[in-house]
Each structure stands twice: as C-alpha cells, then as structure tokens.
Amino acid sequence: MRVKITLACTETGDRNYITTKNKRTNPDRLELKKYSPRLKKYTLHRETK
C-alpha cells in the first residue's frame, strides 16, 4: 500500500517535496538529501506526519 508523504527540510522547516512510499517495506520515517530552494544547497529532508 503506497501512501503520500511530505518531506520537510531539517534546516528551514519548509515542506518542499511530496512523494509516495510503501509502508510495508519502509515502516520508519524516510530521510533523503534533497535540494532546498531557500538555502540554494542540498540538505536533509525528513518525512512529516
């Protein structure tokens, strides 16, 4: 079952990305390095509720 999740920047708190994940294979929170337009660099983005 795939669900939509929002990824928020850990440095600015901006919610920059929306993606999907499979809850069965990835039950924990997703963390990805993505581009932050405000900081103009790649930062860690975490899954929000």
From Swiss-Prot:
Question: Gene3D superfamilies attached here?
Answer: Ribosomal protein L33
Alphabetical keyword list = Ribonucleoprotein, Ribosomal protein
GO biological process: what's one of them? translation
Q: What Pfam families does the database record attribute to this sequence? A: Ribosomal_L33
User: Would I find Aminoacyl-tRNA synthetase among this entry's keywords?
Assistant: no
Q: What GO MF annotations does this protein's record show?
A: structural constituent of ribosome
State the GO CC annotations: cytoplasm; ribonucleoprotein complex; ribosome
Q: Give the family per the record.
A: Belongs to the bacterial ribosomal protein bL33 family.
Listed name of the protein: Large ribosomal subunit protein bL33C
What organism is recorded for this protein?
Bacillus pumilus (strain SAFR-032)
At the highest ranks, the source species' classification is: Bacteria, Bacillati, Bacillota, Bacilli, Bacillales
